[in-house]
Amino acid sequence: MNHTTKKCLITFMIVLFSMSFLFPSVSSARNHTSYAASTASVPSGQYYRSQEVALHSHVQKASLYYTTDGSQPTTQSQLYKKPIHIETDTTLKVSVYKKNRRLSTSTYNYRFVTREDIASSFLSFEYQGMPYRLYIPKNHKRGKAYPLVLFLHGGGERGTDNQKQLLANDGAALWASPEVQKKHPSYVLAPQARNAVDGGFALTRNSQNEIDLTNVFQFSPDLHKAYDVLQHVLTSYQIDQKRIYATGLSQGGFGTYQLNITYPRLFAAMIPIAGGADPSKAGILAHKPIWAFHAEDDSIIPISYARNTIQAIQKAGGQPLYTEYASKYGYDHASWTPAYETPGLTDWLFAQRRSFR
């Protein structure tokens, strides 16, 4: 290499080095854009419940402007100050600005499903004369066992249509909702009891079909059938035997207690709502993870049923979680509405695993 060639090569390298400062690489530019982009506490996806979306940017002293109609945000758009409440299909666009200069724009798409949508994803079966619905986790993997949530409905959902137990409330829908299944893929089982005087997962009516709680602690015929349905499902699918859960409301609340007392080693945890257990037997549940709910002004199932049950469990050394809604809220015999909306409830349930005491 002669002197002239060396000189040209050195000059070229100096120019190239200088240009690297004037024109950052594509990779660097992308990294800068990524750093400047906003982040959302709730990712894009499908949801059943309304969401509170918190926004954040790593850029110091930056301002976030957003729109919820899919249009490009400007400094004239809504300035982000607090979490954004979203409950309908929404395209959220967020732009990060600093000194009136837009650094990035991010798009988040939220789509919502209805209870009917969720119900349609349940399979429909009948076993030994009892209708039941079963949700199978999407994209379940062969050879992998998944948890199962058993839901026992109340007296108003009795029948043979195999639908009311899914559509009347969130007792089954919640566990099969997109956001819960994404975090905790699981089976959801919802049997349906007969609409008869002695029908239901607890005996709450007399021969005149009037509310009568005299025999409410008896193991009802339909609860026996529900247990058989559960056993059938447990042997037919790959269920994690350490993560079988029970929840129920009203008649189903009593049934949830009764199943756990009769088969104390079957369930990992339980969520009984507006129900109760025989205080003389409730001590059996001392080591069971329980989160119970009841309304103080319940006009159908008196609050004493829940209080007496919880006190009996505590006396036996148990530490059940118990949420009682004061009369001022007016929930009456519908405490399952706020109960199934309790923050952290689903995470709490799926965190429980059966022990072998």
List each language-model region with its residue ranges.
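Short, compositionally stereotyped local motifs that mark structural "simplifiers"
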Residues: 30-116
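The conserved beta1-alpha1 loop
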Residues: 152-154, 294-295
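Primarily recognizes the serine-hydrolase "nucleophile elbow" in alpha/beta-hydrolase
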Residues: 234-236, 242-284
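Sec-dependent N-terminal signal peptides of Gram-positive bacterial secreted proteins and lipoproteins
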Residues: 4-29
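A domain-start/cap signature at the N-terminus of enzymes
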Residues: 30-33, 40, 104-148, 186, ...
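C-terminal catalytic histidine-bearing segment of alpha/beta-hydrolase fold enzymes
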Residues: 289-357
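Gly/Ser-rich "nucleophile elbow"/oxyanion-hole loop immediately N-terminal to the catalytic nucleophile
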Residues: 139-144, 202-249
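Active-site machinery of serine-nucleophile hydrolases
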Residues: 148, 155-223
